[in-house]
Amino acid sequence: MQTYDAGTFDVIVVGAGHAGVEAGLASGRMGAKTLMLTINLDMVAFMPCNPSVGGPAKGVVVREIDALGGEMGRNTDKTYIQMRMLNTGKGPAVRALRAQADKWDYQHEMKHTIEKEENITLRQGLVDRLVIEDGVCKGVITNSGAIYYAKTVVITTGTFSRGEIIVGELRYSSGPNNQQPSVKLSEHLEELGFELRRFKTGTPPRVKSSTIDYSKTEEQPGDDHPRAFSFDTVEMMLEQLPCWLTYTNETTHEIIQANLHRSPMFTATKKGTGARYCPSIEDKIVRFSDKPRHQIFLEPEGKNTEEVYVQGLSTSLPEEVQREMLRTIPGLENVEMMRVGYAIEYDAVMPDQLWPSLETKLVEGLFTAGQINGTSGYEEAAGQGLMAGINAARKVFEKEPVILGRDQAYIGVLIDDLVTKGTEEPYRLLTSRAEYRLLLRHDNADLRLTEIGHEIGLISDERYERFLAKQRAIEAEKERLQKTRIKPTAEVQAMLKEIGSGELKDGILAADLLRRPEITYDKIAQIVSRETFVTDEIAEQVEIQIKYEGYIQKSNLQVEKMKRMEDKKIPENIDYDAISGLATEALEKLKKIEPLSIAQASRISGVNPADISILLVYIEQGKIAKVSK
């Protein structure tokens, strides 16, 4: 095919899903001339699976994206149809916001946001190859012969990468939702020497709302006072749509059991590795055969559609089996299926081939982000996309990459896990993966990351000033409570008795009283007068910082210890073969991962403390061998 020069840019982003839109917006807003290429302009920021944003760990990622200057939180606040704070009965480390989004409004709003950015060109096109010169990525070539040149390229092709949809015995080449897949780019990456692996994910059927008998289900309303994802959002929509809870039963399970031989999950037709934490209904009834029922949530996909997402019923069973099992579920006896559930297999680049900046080790100037890196979920994709876009733009401007630490953000945990440990299955972010999760809370994402967002140019001066004012207000209120003494008056004793807290024998500082588990900031406010108004947001922050002060200090000490290890950098020219005493597995892993610090090396699977000690001695003695040839 004849090719032609279609233009030159600073950054090219391939794909416009949740990773791609964050990468493109970050790059463009930082001043880089950015081209975003996507197979179908009608699919920008499309939600091919669950129409929701947030949840445990993931909701914190959305807040972090917002604190750094990304778009997912703002877009969700504009387009949600339900908002709920999860785990409110637990500690602040595991609380998380989750929204049901209006699927169609979400993508239209995001596309409009991109179109308004003056530094971004949004264009429809299918990328088949990269332009590589002397190991450096210089651009992309589309299937129509257009050559676009750039200083850096970010690939965010997600499940479109050589995608194949599977429904029972039916298998065909496709991206999600029957879109055109990206086949030749995967083949080209293999030609370049990248290690790819087949992963799998799935989605449940969609059913028609008017054919559901909601009287047989349990209503799940949103919060009366919904919280925002974005620190920029001032007003929240109060009108929300409910979700509905129902359950599978023994009849459902019998139908599935009788058709397991037709499920790709249990036959040789499935080649990809599936997500452990998002199992299909077939997988659930086999793995948890003792359970008589499983939860099913009926979630509306938007305000102006009849489609309802059947959460908990992800499946790739044949179409007629899906219809039969749906109709065994209470409330769905006469349901009409609008879209069939399916599994999709796709290519993933093994992420240990990346630097922590998300630039590939094999090709300079080439970055990858999102599900192509082996992750699952919109939020994980968006977090990677944001960081890849930031670092692609910074490379153009000859600046050092931004690498978030495990103590700074869940995004930092996510990327470090990927590039240091790799993944054998679609990676899902969990609170248990973060060793400093008390520091990485939903409520303090702005306190952790706004400074960085402002420094790199994604947070405006106006927003930064508001952030500084909030910081000052928090410190002022903490100081006031640490100086204010509460006397054991009749009013105070009555309040304490009412909530089952021990009465005071002597006066006590307000901050010390607040440390009691049963005492809230609101209770303190009832007995301690205030000269200035304190917002709910500031009150929450003051209460958490005072109440959990001891635990937070302990976590900070652990962070300091870890940072001393992070500060011990491993020289770029180190020759691991020259280090005697390293275990064979450790030697192989260190050569493959190429860790940047002793701390990162210590997190590599197969590298044990003895290997780290040998490595430390080698570096500290200055025995850095000549560069390997």
From Swiss-Prot:
GO terms for biological process: tRNA methylation; tRNA wobble uridine modification. One of its GO terms (cellular component) is cytosol. Its cofactor is FAD. It is found in: Cytoplasm. GO terms for molecular function: flavin adenine dinucleotide binding. Transmembrane segments: none annotated. NAD(+) binds at residues 274-288. It comes from the Bacteria. InterPro entries: FAD/NAD-bd_sf (IPR036188), GIDA_C_N (IPR049312), MnmG (IPR004416), MnmG-rel (IPR002218), MnmG-rel_CS (IPR020595), MnmG_C (IPR026904), MnmG_C_subdom (IPR047001), MnmG_C_subdom_sf (IPR044920). FAD binds at G15, A16, G17, H18, A19, G20, V127, S182, Q371. Residues 203-226 are annotated as: Disordered. It holds the Pfam family GIDA_C_1st. Its main location: cytoplasm. The keyword Flavoprotein applies. Residues 215-226 have a biased composition (Basic and acidic residues). Belongs to the MnmG family. HAMAP family: MnmG_GidA. Homodimer. Heterotetramer of two MnmE and two MnmG subunits. This is tRNA uridine 5-carboxymethylaminomethyl modification enzyme MnmG.
